[in-house]
Amino acid sequence: AHFQSGFMMHPKAWNLHDWAEIYFEGIGWVPVDQSFGIPTFARNADEEYFFLGGIDSWRMIVNSDYGMPLIPEKKYPRSETVDFQRGEVEWEGGNLYFPKWDYHMDIEYLDN
């Protein structure tokens, strides 16, 4: 298994999120998200356990590993030592931790 993180991109409800992928011989990497538990829409066993062997399509992957070095390398300690969903900011005086800067992301949902 390995770690993945990024953003849940559900319409009107996007946020940072982490999940996993499990490798099955002959199938490949299968995403799982145990944090979603049993969905309220579940009407049968396949739907109840969907997130234990599947994942919805509302994900944007930022990381497929954790604790990796940044390029270019930072001079000061990182704000986030596990993943890199929001990015890192530093200046000649040191690291700027998350409360000292913000980000903005526009999301456009396309109809099929």
Residue ranges of predicted features:
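Active-site rim recognition segments
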Residues: 11-111
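Short, well-structured beta-strand/strand-turn elements
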Residues: 1-10
